């Protein structure tokens, strides 16, 4: 202990507060100046030398100051380099040569070579994980072949990765040109030209025009996806050498009637120039593929090139060698940089191993600085500070936890107990880095990020909060440029922004060149179905662990409590990063996402943030190129910097991915919407961006369910991969669709093409022997690839099996995107006619299946003729068969007169017979499951039991995330009774067979007595004292910012505003807000008034002149919502009437199928079980009654009460009881 105290005293000696110290310090606006030399301009945009900076630090760190002087923050300017204190030593944050106090992988800093004399830059094989596109202008004295390819300016595609020998490398690929197409006849007519040379001159004139030249010089044309090294030289320098024009013959993708035609293929040396010309050269002329960036061109135009995987360097076509860049010309933080051309690269497609990439798992803690310290911090407020950042560093190759860093504003002592526990778990001891000011902490974090240079970063909600807070803070408060803190030293993309906001949710993206951000919050919301997605709830469900929580409102007091108390915050911060790291290696999201990137040939960042449309588009683009088709341009949609339109359109689709492999999801049903809005109908991407998923066709057919409780076996047939198989079987595609029979001249109906009635329109699709569907080819190849991958899994090592499983999952994801790709009006290549045809065929298949079953197996004799084995499966009931439900890709068939075991055994043969007799390959029905008992409620809502007693449910309230545990517990208990108890099941079947109105005047079957006892138990529990608030917590997602809601009178919004009113930590968008419903007390009424005023929904009661007292106005349920923590801490009474009514409502919606789907009748019948609340007679009145000779009644015993309830339920008089 003494040694520790001595170490602490040494550590504290370096801390400096400029407000009480004697070093040079200048307050803003004081008129003082510092006698310092002006620093030379930095060679790179990341900080390497800082002589003064804005000093902001909390006053609570002035531990010897009086208490009344320890609130708020110090703000000023400090004249000295940024410092960091670690283990009793002081370091200069930006002095690379001093060694530093955090791990570093970078070996070239500020143009200086720290690689060592023995460093060998040679390598042959290297792995790529990210790709960045830049522009470069070559100097006139550079004679290399690479300068010729970038003169006057050219695009460079940089492959970032690691060599097989462990060097961090950047391979700059020159000679990749941007190109697009224009119809020759249209161009010649518009420009009055006939030759390629004339077109070149016309484009040069376009670039030279005064207004456009200025725009070109300002970079308002084309696309920049990463760094922008080399600058830009303006439109005036554009010459004929910048362009290359060829006349080629192609066919446009849309419609069978399109014929091969001549097109000008215009290529430019840089994507900026090419994009500018595509946008501004005769905008009325239709362009093709102009929005395709040069990165995509590199990957698609070269065989087997991949966005994520291995390459080998080799001599070029004519023996050209790669060029090693000298250190002084490095533009990234890589160890080695190479110049090459595409022919110097040889992909290695079969190599699946990963190099030793590093993962940074981080978390930030913030604190409000002035006013109310309990308020939630805002990054743009200079007083709201980042006080701690935890960084845990892992090896992706070994999954080893290698380092733990804690950046702390002010002194911070991690307890010895916590450090020892880390060592005991096999984790490194935390290294604490302490800072005097927030600027120094943030600059140190960014410098560490640059110097350690991890390839991957993760955390929990880092996209919406951590990254966003850091970026906004350093740019708005400290004016730090971030373009040099990714892999590129200057001009790199380092940005967080919102990509879409619609009526459902808000989505953000973060793009940092050379750093892939994988947010585990997004992974959790996609993989799990939980009432809450707070980190504690997720790790509890996935890992079986629970975090030690530190409420936000306690952070200010802990932070002001000294180094030990700040250490508690540090342990909490480290704990969050550690748990997220465990989640990461549980789900391994990088493996699945990288497999998608490889298959779709797009970068990993685009896979994460740019939606599903781009995945199909690039695959279709490659196949179209091979088949001599060209794709119409959809500017501002393919571009990753302007995805808002297609992203917004995909929000609904992302959450409703179509069923592809039903074996992975036992109860999965194709998630296609049943109904469609009347959205945009144009098929060229027209319509306003950001207006949601606009479709203009009817959804899939649903055969109305025969609601009720079915105790005879019900077999469920599923169409395997329904929509992909329809596209394949019927050869559906852009290229096979004909809108007019004139285009089909010489072709025979049914033989050469099929006709479909879609709404009031006839659509024609030619068969594969006439023209093969490109979409069908993609699906066929992907399915074959997935089958081959899955076949390798059983014989692979565990490590290989994980990679293969992620690969087959990636193929499944892309296959499921194809139908949605055509059906989104604001997508990259919309064709609503294809999507409408798919759903039309799906409807017809359902109807054909129903009619086939009802005719082919109508009698027992017909069934046994088709399936002789059915003879042995008879039971005592008369035979019948009926399709009781059909939903998109599922058919429910009820058999009476056959045993459950028999139907289960015959199911596969039945599905095969239907597939063979009715459908084209690869469409096929599969026997998915057989229900022993099935409560079929309405469309998409059912509960049943299959073989082995497993319960399956879909769409019922019991599995909804927003129900409280009290309701879920009793609702589930009642469902268990219905499905597993013979007496209750028999009674339920009897109830279903009788018209529901009859049960109002007659007793329920006696088998329902167990059902009633559960309801009585629930009533007694809800009316008992000392309720556990946790059992009554409900949740709802904050899907968008509160001000974006049209209806603000929602329970979770009420709680949001109450938290704001009390200056509590506010939930983030997409976070689930917990709430309970409280009793209407005077306090609840007061707070409801305040909340309604805050959200602009206040209602002033109408005042009337009357002598009578006004009745108490009943508040809306939403006004009575309250934060569960506040209820527990303040003993606020719950609204028990609401909860029991909610329970009755929930189970009535579930069990209404027993009573003809009449909710009112169901609820009234269930209320028979509820004991009546006795009327309490006032004491004075009771005394008068006794004196008058009335006998005093004593309360019933519980046993008598139960007897009377059951008598009421099962011995009801024939006349209906009077309802008050």
Swiss-Prot record:
Reaction(s) catalysed (UniProt annotation): DNA(n) + a 2'-deoxyribonucleoside 5'-triphosphate = DNA(n+1) + diphosphate; Endonucleolytic cleavage to 5'-phosphomonoester
EC number: 2.7.7.7, 3.1.26.4
Single GO BP term: DNA-templated DNA replication
Disulfide bonds, paired cysteine numbers: none
Any Gene Ontology CC annotation: host cell nucleus
Subunit-structure text: Forms a complex with the ssDNA-binding protein, the DNA polymerase processivity factor, and the alkaline exonuclease. Interacts with the helicase-primase complex composed of the primase, the helicase and the primase-associated factor; this interaction may coordinate leading and lagging strand DNA synthesis at the replication fork.
Function, as annotated: Replicates viral genomic DNA. The replication complex is composed of six viral proteins: the DNA polymerase, processivity factor, primase, primase-associated factor, helicase, and ssDNA-binding protein. Additionally, the polymerase contains an intrinsic ribonuclease H (RNase H) activity that specifically degrades RNA/DNA heteroduplexes or duplex DNA substrates in the 5' to 3' direction. Therefore, it can catalyze the excision of the RNA primers that initiate the synthesis of Okazaki fragments at a replication fork during viral DNA replication.
Protein name: DNA polymerase catalytic subunit
Organism: Equine herpesvirus 1 (strain Ab4p)
